[in-house]
Amino acid sequence: MNSEMKVLVTGANGFLAANVVRELLSRDIEVRGMVRQHADMKSLEGLDFEIFHGNITNASDVDKAVSGCSVIIHAAADTSQRYSQASPLYRVNVEATRLLVEAAQRHKTDRFIFISTGNTIGFGSRENPGHEGNPIGSLFQKSGYAMSKLEAEKRIQEEVKKNNLNAVIMNPTFMIGPFDAKPGSGRIFKMMYPNKMVFIPRGGKNFTDVRAASTAICNAITMGKTGERYLLAGENLSYHEFLEIVRFGKKTIPVLIPDWVLIFLGVCGSFLRRLGIHSELSISNAKILVSDDYYTGRKAAEELKMPPTSVRVAVNDAIDWFQKDKML
């Protein structure tokens, strides 16, 4: 075990964080995983590391969690997509980040790695994919989740400039792979894999193997420029192309949803939200589904040595894990 380094991973039982913990342990790095009391630990079964039960919005818990750690990987977040405003997510995604940054400075940690989202960076086309220099797109300005993460990014960058916080920001795109116990992004397999007929939108997005993202994040302990953002991006695929990979060997029939149908459903969803009724779909995320949400991961490949993504391998490994865990 690397006795010179202990890494705190917040939200350690989450999809990305669980893969990060595995990558750290494979490098013989000591890990402290911060999770809520009574958290579901299925994604971390069989791993030997220190578990710290606490609340990331509690200053005392945060201070105790950070104490003795030389690196912080802050992956805990409220990823709910049902809010159009950042305020309901502010306490977890912004205030908790502030508490961790303050604790990092008090305890003189060597590096702070903040896990944000690719959605804080404007997307592009296949020919001209989104990169770290792009401001957030207009569609994601109506996503409470994206805006709360963008606010947290700004707080970190201010601390870098004013108080020399040694921090880097990771912006992963849509991640796929094993150990998605919740599931989060893995819900897409539940929608696509078992069904003979699958309704898909016209658009597409960037798909990243969660293990490639985890490698880049762990490399960021010693690589990457302070204050910089890094898109952890893999392959740009339309939803139809992605379905072709997911349905490999199965007679699944793809049915394209007309744009106007999705937009209409999005309008209905936004109306329900105004009435206080939960709806996963809104006008803004309906428009995102019919857009080409594409990015490049060139910067992370060059500066963080992020390995390339094979979506086919990531999909197969994810499906194998879900089936072994009887989730598919």
PLM feature spans:
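A conserved pocket-lining segment of Rossmann-fold NAD(P)-dependent short-chain dehydrogenase/reductase
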Residues: 138-140, 190-208, 212
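Active-site Tyr-X1-5-Lys
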Residues: 140-168
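Conserved Rossmann-fold NAD(P)-dependent oxidoreductase catalytic core, especially the SDR/UDP-sugar
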Residues: 98-144
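Substrate-positioning beta->alpha
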Residues: 183-184, 201-222, 228
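Glycine/proline-rich active-site loop of Rossmann-fold NAD(P)-dependent oxidoreductases
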Residues: 163-165, 177-187, 220-230
